[in-house]
């Protein structure tokens, strides 16, 4: 029999389902031993909850498809995002639908005690895997920011897959064996089959909260704190147009390396690298222009000195081929004039003067075009040798810039996870140690649980909003577009020189000038 009414203890409309009965000799005989009534809450609640489930499943499936099908997303961070999306899919496919039915039935469990244990185990598995995946992602971002050049050597596909496997093994150990613990430590929770209550064992709640949330949360905050410090230092260097380099000092037979801040002394080496079309306030760079292939303008290092001896082959095509720039002597400020472009084929450019030695070596890159008014200036003294594979370093710097752009999106994902799950992992231990502290414990538990579940729906929305690569991938998948090759502004071998971050200054186009000031 169905009856519609209003629960006196709740504001929601409900539908009451009662078992069929028969009357014999003024005696009521129930046809089943199930609970006498199931209160179904308002249908709009069901529509809302199952819409959340559908969005969660669809969004995370889209993330998995995007990373698997788009080459530009298949990187170590992309594999971690797939692992995170799988954890969110578990929430959307198993945990959220069962919890939705539990809410719609007005907190009446319909699936039996065994499925209640499976429900809690899958919930713990997914939430633990999510935060540990985010922890690995944050450590990955920290390593990429600390050592962008050596990052690709340290973080391989095999190591990332091993880290992902470790995350899931840890999550499974914490969740499914916990069923035995729950039944042993909390047998009173299994007396009523219409209820699905989580264990109140203080030891398990404390241990699981520590491993599932607080330890990875500490590692995440530590890693992103370091990332923030590194990014702040680099952004300051970019605004100043200065890059810190390592200085090697030799005292007799012993040699030690010291890294010093360029901003602290005028006698320390300063490297400025500029490209773009914006105006430069400095008069020494105003008329400088460097053409690298077709689209990138790069103003290379400037070195002021008295004399320049170039032992190179001069051609009439006014180009510079594969320069090997080597300054062997530092010098005082003076001007260098050039009336035409020159061609150096694997030769040295020797800067001679009476100052302390300065050495700069760049391995031979591809063909470039150097305009007649371009300058190369590096302040003296600099006593170090840097041998760089410029093509490879340029590619690595392109990846680094791309990864740093992705780091912002991932930091938002981490922030959303912390905001969504912190209430649950604060409330659950409190209720285990102080049952009388909350008068409406069931309502609060429902709220904090669904706040955590909503995080699984938010992640794909964050990707589509803050990640240009994911937004493009989602658009291509949903509209059945073929992947188009993306043009990049960093295609020249010397587009990014000298590792890590550089000073970027834009300059307006100026007519060629035959002299350098």
From Swiss-Prot:
Q: Is Transferase one of the keywords?
A: no
Q: Which residues cross the membrane?
A: 47-67, 78-98, 109-129, 160-180, 210-230, 410-430, 443-463
Gene Ontology molecular-function annotations:
dopamine neurotransmitter receptor activity; G protein-coupled serotonin receptor activity; neurotransmitter receptor activity
Name the glycosylated positions: 25, 106
Chain ranges on the Extracellular side, renumbered to this chain: 1-46, 99-108, 181-209, 431-442
Membrane topology value = Multi-pass membrane protein
Pfam family, any one = 7tm_1
Q: Does the keyword Cell membrane apply?
A: yes
Q: Which residues form a coiled coil?
A: none
- Record's Gene Ontology CC terms? dendrite; plasma membrane; postsynaptic membrane
Q: Where is this region: Disordered?
A: 309-339
Q: Which Gene3D superfamilies match?
A: Rhodopsin 7-helix transmembrane proteins
- Which family does the record assign? Belongs to the G-protein coupled receptor 1 family.
Write down what this protein is called: Dopamine receptor 4
Which organism is this protein's natural source?
Answer: Caenorhabditis elegans
Supply the gene name: dop-4
């Amino acid at each position: 029999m169905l009856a519609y009414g209003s629960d006196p203890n709740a504001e929601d409309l409900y539908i009451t389902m009662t078992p069929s009965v028969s009357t014999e000799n003024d005696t009521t005989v129930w046809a089943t031993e199930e609970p006498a009534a199931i209160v179904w809450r308002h249908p709009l609640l069901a529509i809302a909850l199952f819409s959340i489930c559908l969005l969660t499943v669809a969004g995370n499936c889209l993330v998995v498809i995007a990373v698997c099908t788009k080459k530009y997303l298949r990187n170590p961070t992309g594999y971690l995002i797939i692992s995170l999306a799988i954890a969110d899919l578990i929430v959307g496919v198993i945990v959220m639908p069962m919890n939705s039915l539990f809410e719609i039935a007005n907190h009446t469990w319909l699936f039996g005690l065994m499925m209640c244990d499976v429900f809690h185990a899958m919930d713990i598995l997914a939430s633990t895997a999510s935060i540990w995946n985010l922890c690995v992602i944050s450590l990955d971002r920290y390593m990429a920011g600390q050592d962008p050049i050596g990052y690709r050597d340290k973080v391989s596909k095999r190591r990332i897959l091993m880290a992902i496997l470790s995350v899931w093994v840890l999550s499974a150990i914490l969740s499914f064996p916990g069923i035995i613990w729950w039944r042993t430590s909390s047998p009173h929770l299994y007396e009523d089959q219409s209820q699905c209550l989580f264990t109140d064992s203080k030891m398990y709640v404390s241990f699981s909260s520590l491993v599932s949330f607080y330890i990875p949360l500490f590692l995440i905050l530590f890693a992103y704190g370091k990332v923030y410090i590194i990014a702040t230092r680099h952004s300051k260097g970019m605004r100043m147009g200065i890059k810190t380099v390592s200085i090697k000092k030799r005292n007799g037979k012993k040699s030690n390396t010291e890294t010093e801040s360029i901003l602290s002394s005028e006698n320390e080496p300063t490297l400025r690298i500029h490209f773009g079309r914006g105006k430069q306030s400095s008069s020494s760079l105003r008329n400088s222009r460097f053409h690298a292939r077709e689209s990138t303008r790069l103003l290379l290092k400037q070195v002021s000195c008295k004399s320049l001896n170039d032992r190179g082959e001069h051609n009439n095509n006014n180009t510079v081929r594969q320069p090997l720039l080597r300054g062997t002597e530092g010098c005082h400020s003076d001007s260098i004039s050039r009336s035409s472009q020159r061609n150096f084929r694997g030769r040295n450019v020797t800067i001679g003067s009476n100052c302390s030695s300065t050495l700069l070596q760049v391995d031979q890159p591809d063909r470039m075009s150097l305009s007649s008014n371009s300058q190369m200036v590096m302040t003296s003294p600099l006593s170090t040798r840097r041998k760089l594979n410029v093509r490879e370093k340029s590619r690595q710097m392109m990846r680094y810039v791309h990864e740093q752009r992705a780091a912002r999106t991932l930091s938002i994902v981490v922030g959303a996870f912390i905001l969504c799950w912190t209430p649950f992992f604060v409330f659950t231990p409190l209720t285990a140690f102080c049952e009388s502290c909350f008068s409406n414990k069931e309502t609060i538990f429902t709220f904090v649980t669904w706040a955590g579940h909503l995080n699984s729906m938010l992640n794909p929305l964050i990707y589509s909003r803050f990640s240009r690569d994911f937004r493009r991938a989602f658009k291509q998948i949903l509209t059945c577009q073929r992947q188009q090759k993306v043009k990049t502004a960093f295609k020249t071998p010397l587009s990014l020189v000298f590792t890590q971050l550089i000073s970027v200054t834009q300059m307006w186009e100026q007519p060629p000038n035959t002299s350098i000031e």
